[in-house]
UniProtKB/Swiss-Prot annotation:
PANTHER family given in the database record: 40S RIBOSOMAL PROTEIN S15A (PTHR11758)
Family: Belongs to the universal ribosomal protein uS8 family.
Function: One of the primary rRNA binding proteins, it binds directly to 16S rRNA central domain where it helps coordinate assembly of the platform of the 30S subunit.
Annotated InterPro entries: Ribosomal_uS8, Ribosomal_uS8_CS, Ribosomal_uS8_sf
Domain of life of the native organism: Bacteria
Pfam families: Ribosomal_S8
A biological process term (GO) from this entry: translation
Keywords on record: Ribonucleoprotein, Ribosomal protein, RNA-binding, rRNA-binding
Gene Ontology CC terms: ribonucleoprotein complex; ribosome
Name recorded for this polypeptide: Small ribosomal subunit protein uS8
Quaternary structure, from the entry: Part of the 30S ribosomal subunit. Contacts proteins S5 and S12.
MF (Gene Ontology): rRNA binding; structural constituent of ribosome
Keyword Ribosomal protein appears in the UniProt entry: yes
Lineage: Bacteria, Bacillati, Bacillota, Bacilli, Bacillales
Amino acid sequence: MVMTDPIADMLTRIRNANMVRHEKLEIPASKLKREIADILKREGFIRDVEFVEDSKQGIIRVFLKYGQNNERVITGLKRISKPGLRVYAKSNEVPRVLNGLGIAIISTSQGVLTDKEARAKQAGGEVLAYVW
């Protein structure tokens, strides 16, 4: 079966594993998914990420992060730009998520960036997701 929106599938897998407090999960790899996983790690939303090569496309293994009392670090994940309705933002219209408490993941000509990085580089692009 052909997957229509692999980014939404990745976010849904992370959301579901986070809700039942799994320690790790595996996602079929792609370059864009790897960049999104790296951003989530760099911003402190996940504990670790590793890339496992296999005979097909590879696997991204994501290790989820929880607080001291087992509370979730990722409160919410939302796919913004979808295959049926793409959402773009100019460099001066890059959105803020919860007044800076969350991040927007944006695909720009300079790579996949957070909203803060896109503002600093004055780059616009496709708004992939919000994470808070």
